[in-house]
Amino acid sequence: MHSGTVTVVNDWALFGHPLFLQRLEDLIEEVEGLAEEDPDGFHHHAHYKLLEKVEEAILVRVPTNPAAPEYFQGKTLGKENGHWRRIKNGLPNRYRLFFQFRSDAPKSIIYAWLNDEATLRKDGSKTDVYAVFLAKLKRGEIPSSFAELERDAGPIPGHAG
């Protein structure tokens, strides 16, 4: 894991794969730009709302109980990827955020990937969020094992926006 200040919530250390951390940083920068352009109305923009929901999920909801049944993704990614969890509820429609966790010490949650407008949920589509995430796993762009994911991960900022 990369060094830096680690955010800990409910005894869970929070980390992100570089793809997630970059997506989060890009989203923050975009929202900051929106705030400069329209200080009174930026909070109505879809990307502000997405950032707000992602922050709530990664800093509040998931660290409350990352093993909650609502995060199970079933067999959508295949039997061999059943260890992956996904955040669906609480995010804008058709967005998913994938993560893994380990409850043995040190307790860690690693957020791996959040889809974008080009990869929204659409069952059967080549650009469906699950199809794209599975392709990233198969190409090794995102490691499937927790140990490899942990090796690549960096700390999640304590307050993203």
Model-identified regions with their sequence ranges:
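Enriched for short, Lys/Arg-rich terminal
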Residues: M1-F15, E29, L77-G78, G82-G161
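N-terminal "first-domain core" detector
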Residues: M1-I58
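A structural signal for alpha-helix termini and helix-coil/disorder junctions
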Residues: D26, E30-G33, T64-A68, R139, ...
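Secondary-structure transition/capping residues
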Residues: V31, A35-D38, P69, Q73, ...
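A short, hydrophobic secondary-structure junction motif
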Residues: H47-T64, K136-S144
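A short, surface-exposed loop/turn module that caps and links secondary-structure elements
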Residues: E56, V60-N89
